[in-house]
Amino acid sequence: LAVKSIREICGQYKIESLMTFGGEPLIYPEVVCAIHKMATEMGIKKRELITNGYFSRKKERIKEVVKSLEESGVESLLLSVDAFHQETIPIDPVKYFAKCVSNSKIHIELGPAWLVSKEDDNPYNLRTKEVLKEFEDLKIPIGAGNVIFPSGNALKYLGEYFDEELSYSSPYDEDPYDIRAISFSPDGSILNGNIHSKKILDILEEYQP
């Protein structure tokens, strides 16, 4: 359905970029590759993937998936590595994945999540800097990453690190009256509809904030 939706959207709109992310998208690498293959065929120039890089411990499987990503047309990859991901994700298979990607035609950057700000001197940011050092020998550039916004679980479990006197605004909120990007949820939900029950073009045309 995702592949079909991309084809239909590109038939009606000029799409400049496509990104697959999660959850962890590479748990389903065949789906990710099918999506990027269609994006390539439809002339979408910017094709990105965000992943934590952990979907297998087997080196042959990791190499196989990277080759498939390259062949499907993935242009750039943002690898999420930081204190939060590495609490539960082993670093060795992720580092091997990063090495394989850096040896391919796919541009790769490390994308850490910072707590409060990159400059803030808290234990999570210090740990993130330690994690990033693990990748220094691969000479992979470090991107801007993202800053954790104080809402939901972040506010519940990390609230002590945020200044109660400050007013925070999410950098990820979009104006519902000026939609520049759309995002598909794993269950097919998008905007006010679902592609399992309605055609994507109908959802877009009937959208109301």
Where are these regions (language model features)?
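Radical SAM/AdoMet-radical enzyme domain recognition
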Residues: 2-20, 28-132
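Substrate/cofactor-recognition hotspot
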Residues: 24
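Accessory C-terminal segments flanking Radical SAM cores
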Residues: 143-209
